[in-house]
Regions:
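Alpha-helical transmembrane segments in multi-pass integral membrane proteins
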Residues: 6, 21, 29-47, 61-101, ...
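Residues within membrane-spanning alpha-helices of integral membrane proteins
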Residues: 49, 53-56, 111, 146, ...
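Generic alpha-helical transmembrane segments of integral inner-membrane proteins
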Residues: 57, 146, 150-154, 158, ...
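Membrane-interface helix-loop-helix regions
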Residues: 75-99, 126-137, 141-196, 200, ...
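Hydrophobic alpha-helical transmembrane segments
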Residues: 103-113, 194-201
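Hydrophobic, membrane-inserted alpha-helices
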Residues: 178, 198-205, 221-229, 274-281
C-alpha cells in the first residue's frame, strides 16, 4: 500500500490542513488508514533519532556535573557550577554541552512532533483512534518504568544504596512510583509524568487541528506559555507534577504541521539548522539558567531544530552520526537507568575532594565521571531496550490490531 500523505499549505490564518485526493477517499470510507504528516510511513529520519541520542547524553553530562566534592573549607560545591555567570569559559562550555534541562525540553518538543505523525497513521475516526493511541503511549512508557523501578528496588534491598531516603521504598511508595504518581525513587521520571499528562492533550489538539486548522494549535500554545509563568501551574520538576512545559509538546505539533511548507519557502536549511542549534545553546547563558524566558526560547529553537532536521537537507552520515543514532535508539532506557550511576557519583565527595586537592580540575573529574557512567550504563540500557521496550511495543501493536477489526466493523455498521 502506498503511504497516504497529508499536504499542507498556508491560509490567511497560517498553516492549515489541506485534504488530498486520497484523504478525501478515506473520508468517504474508501481508504481505511492514514499516512504520516508530510513524511511517508516508510521514510525514516535518522537525524531525529540522532538528536534524541545527543539529548540523552546531554542529560547524563548535566547530572555528572552536579556531583560534589569537599573543598578546603569542607563545603561541598558541585564539580561544575550551575551558573553561567562569573565562571570560566570551560565551565560555561560544559554547562552548554550538559544543558540537561534544555535536553528535556527538546525531548518534549520531539514527542509532540512524533506523536502528531503517529496519530496521522491511525484510523481517521476520533473514537477509533483513541484506543490505539493511548494504549501505545502506556505500553511505550510504563514497561521500562516498571523495569527501572525494579532495578532500583533490588539495588536498595541488596545494598541499601539509593538516591532517596529509605522511606521511599515502602510498598505503597514503590507502587506509586511505578505508576508515575510519585518520582522520589528516580527523580528523572518527573518528565514521564509530564509525557503522560501531555498524551490526552496531544490527542485532543490533533483532532481539533483536523477540524479547525492552525488556530487550534496556536491558541493553546500561547495559553500554556502564559500559564507557565504561574508557580502554581508550573510547580517544581521532581516535586509534584510540573505542567509548565506542556506548551513544548504543542510547539512540536506545530513544527510537524507547518514545518514542511516553512522549509520549502526558506533557502539554506542546513545553515538555518546551525543557527537554530546556536540559539538553543545560548538561550540560557544569555537569559539566565532559571529564567522562564530561557525555556520558552529553547522550546522555539527546539521546534526549529526538529523542523530543519525532519524536512531540510539530510544530515551527513558517518561514525559520529551512527553513534548518536545508537544512543537515540536506546535513549529512553539510557535516560532512566543513568540515574543508577548517580547513586555512587553523588555520594563520593571525599574521593572527589582528594582528587581536587591533588591538582585535578573538577571539570576533568566531571568528564571522567561522564565517560565512566556512559560505559557502565550503555550495556544495561541496551538490554532493557531490547527486552523490555521492544516487548512493550510488540504488545501494543498486538492490542491495537485486535481493536481494529472491531472498530472497522462498528464503522461499517454506522455507515
Amino acid at each position: 500500500m502506498q503511504p497516504i500523505r497529508l499536504e499542507f499549505g498556508y491560509s490567511r490564518i497560517g498553516c492549515s490542513a489541506v485534504l488530498s485526493e486520497r484523504i478525501k477517499r478515506r473520508a468517504a470510507g474508501k481508504v481505511s488508514d492514514m499516512g504520516d504528516i508530510a513524511i511517508s510511513r516508510r521514510e525514516f529520519v535518522p537525524g531525529l533519532e540522532a538528536s534524541r541520542g545527543v539529548a540523552a547524553l546531554m542529560v547524563a553530562l548535566f547530572h555528572c556535573g552536579q556531583a560534589t566534592y569537599f573543598d578546603a573549607t569542607r563545603q561541598t560545591p558541585p564539580l561544575v557550577p550551575g551558573s553561567y555567570r562569573s565562571q570560566s569559559y570551560l565551565d560555561a562550555a560544559f554547562r552548554i554541552a550538559g544543558n540537561g534541562h534544555g535536553a528535556v525540553v527538546f525531548f518534549f518538543v520531539l514527542s509532540g512532533f512524533v506523536l502528531m505523525m503517529m496519530l496521522s497513521r491511525q484510523n481517521d475516526d476520533l473514537k477509533g483512534s483513541a484506543g490505539p493511541f493511548l494504549i501505545g503511549r502506556v505500553l511505550r512508557i510504563y514497561p521500562a518504568v516498571f523495569s527501572t523501578i525494579a532495578i532500583f528496588v533490588g539495588l536498595f534491598l541488596l545494598t541499601g544504596m539509593s538516591l532517596g531516603t529509605p522511606a521511599a521504598y515502602s510498598t505503597s511508595n514503590v507502587i506509586a512510583n511505578s505508576l508515575l504518581l510519585r518520582t522520589d525513587i528516580n527523580g528523572v521520571m518527573w518528565s514521564l509524568q509530564t509525557e503522560m499528562i501531555a498524551a490526552p492533550l496531544i490527542f485532543s489538539l490533533y483532532w481539533s487541528w483536523r477540524q479547525w486548522g492552525s488556530p487550534s494549535l496556536l491558541l493553546p500554545a500561547f495559553v500554556l506559555i502564559g500559564l507557565s509563568f504561574s508557580k502554581e501551574w508550573s510547580g517544581t520538576p521532581g516535586n509534584g507534577v510540573s505542567l509548565g512545559n506542556l506548551y513544548s509538546f504543542v510547539v512540536g505539533m506545530i513544527a510537524c504541521a507547518c514545518g514542511k511548507t516553512m522549509v520549502a519557502r526558506l533557502p539554506h536549511s542546513a545553515s538555518l539548522l546551525v543557527l537554530a542549534i546556536a540559539g538553543f545553546a545560548l538561550s540560557r547563558p544569555l537569559l539566565g539558567w532559571w529564567s522562564n524566558w530561557s525555556v520558552i526560547l529553547e522550546t522555539v529553537f527546539a521546534g526549529l531544530i526538529t523542523t530543519f532536521i525532519a524536512y531540510g537537507d539530510p544530515l551527513r552520515e558517518g561514525r559520529l552520526m551512527a553513534a548518536a543514532r545508537y544512543f537515540g535508539r536506546i535513549s529512553y532506557s539510557f535516560y532512566l537507568l543513568h540515574a543508577l550511576t548517580l547513586i555512587a557519583l553523588w555520594n563520593m565527595p571525599a574521593l572527589f575532594g582528594k582528587a581536587v586537592s591533588a591538582g585535578i580540575p573538577p571539570i576533568v573529574l566531571a568528564l571522567v565521571a561522564f565517560v565512566s557512567s556512559v560505559l557502565v550504563i550503555t550495556p544495561l540500557a541496551h538490554l532493557q531496550h531490547a527486552i523490555v521496550e521492544r516487548a512493550g511495543a510488540r504488545l501494543g501493536r498486538a492490542l491495537t490490531w485486535r481493536l481494529r477489526p472491531k472498530l472497522q466493523a462498528d464503522a461499517l455498521q454506522r455507515g
